[in-house]
């Protein structure tokens, strides 16, 4: 390092502590980057890469950005998942001996960004910290630095389950300890696309102990400690706005895994990944940014406590029934700014005068809001506003201190009102009167000299001056003026009298700016005291905002208050898919009933493609989610149970599990439901088994239906193209066939989008192909093939067989290229239960059936004993490979 200049040595010393970040190194009016940072930053930011002499034989790569524009460049890097360490000059270059002392004042990362393009006002920006314990459990702690919110939970289950919970937080960055395995880190970076950071310290930092008073579990405290230590290390500033840690447990809320949230498009659409077109888009009528964030949190975690849901529903009903109360509340909420993030800016010391003016305007609305809610005859409302302080003393303080139209910068003056500080008033008097005196002097000098164009001006270099054009220089009295500057067409002068006043005025103006800055920073410290009260107010106002949002959308869209029942029954009259109905924008939407009494668990849904099966299934899920977040639902009448979980397999393969086929994803999601669902769950399976051969697909579909029916008892909607499965209604007493109706008119299919009892008579697949405008010749050929197939013997559905309780699917039937007889005594029974794809003529032929040898019989016996649903995909593949290898050995 000694071969470099002292400044480059200083850079390298600082950089050594921030190897995983870009180092923005302050040099005068620029932030400079050197070596690899410069090469990479020049590429990412599309700025010029240059070089400089650093003392070694080779020139050092260098690039830089102006300090006043650095914010935008930092945002660009953080948006791409990078970290940026900001290194400032911490001493005056004029007084420095040797190299100016520099220190990193902040490490900006994806999870610690406070403002910018990446921060959506209606979304949290969580930083996650994950701690792994020897017993296989994990603790997950999250912090939103912009609002001060902190949460922690204990997690058990597979690594995939843990990762899905991490993903559900929406965190862009996760903090782990250095013991995490490479495989675990790869899943975090590649699967979840998160920035990885490291922190080994887990003790709660000094001064933050009060935030974990309600946390007693050592595991949870370790996770929070890791999170807090990382935040302190990166931010290097006051964290007065951090809120007490909230403990939550996943079993306190309805569980909806990430796949299901995506399939249902709760907060973003599948295709565009945008809010528009999602359920959140429809329900979001909030007027405040913090209300929008709370709405999304509620949607991520619907309630499962019947009493809490009913409390919300009653408040929504109050707002629905009182139009004037609701409209008055909405008007006041429009004037309320983001109290949570304003409090965060106060704590961080980057709040400006305009922010405090917004805070005052927000607080002016609070007393009327609290008073209106206090008049309601509602225990939930009374409890909600209990302890809410309108902070009237803060409102008064800000009212007498901050100007009505302050500048953006707090270093330019003109931010403090007259009358707030005596010394400031004195300086302003001198400055104001001095300027008045100068205006009078200008008039007097014109009168004395008779030069009407004479003027008194000011610039930062020469101060005040008297300017006279060269044509009028002869009119100036001798000895009165002292030459100060010569211009092309004029001369500038000064007088003793003007010098004296200049000194007074400039001193006053300089002192005004400095005093205003000092007064503002002192005011900011006074506001800090109110941070806890502001955060409590923010929660109250956010909740009221979400409830009025529910009421507004419920009235606009003609939703109805659901009735919650402890029975396992669903009664939805004229239910609608809320988002599809909204997108149709006034066009006729066909409502559908969903009536499943306690003794009816499974709807087997058949019907044409494009007829609305998937929409009907999603509709039920969205109605239940809306009900359990406390919103009215799209129906004319709704009686619903409280579901503990929702499992879905609807739509295209999810890309969260990379490298898996559609069928594998289907099976993984089916396994998830089968392993975790209870009789209080809701299962929605759309076309399970379509990703494999017809034999396999139909067999698996039937086995899954039977298992759900017999072993789980969850309310289930199961759509299928296997019309042969509709005979299951005869053997499964809690299964009912329903179909989406369609009619044929003049050779064309008309979808009625109406759910009716019974099985569909045909699928109309060729008609759908016609709608897609496939070639006429292709359509004609498809009709010929269909006629031939329909003339053949139909597939026979196997009769139900008695299986052990732990088995999920019936015994597999081995199919080789040639029919095989295993044991003569079993052939008849197996033929009776086999699915036949052969025509009547072919299947009736008598064939000699070779018998399996001992090795093949042994392999078949092993296959029969395998419980696929207890195996991971990799284990199943390895087992298949082992058996195949065994058969191939001579």
Curated annotation (Swiss-Prot):
One of its GO terms (molecular function) is mismatched DNA binding. The keyword Kinase does not apply. It comes from the Bacteria. Pfam families: MutS_I, MutS_II, MutS_III, MutS_IV, MutS_V. One of its GO terms (cellular component) is cytosol. SMART domains: MUTSac (SM00534), MUTSd (SM00533). Belongs to the DNA mismatch repair MutS family. This is DNA mismatch repair protein MutS. The gene is mutS.
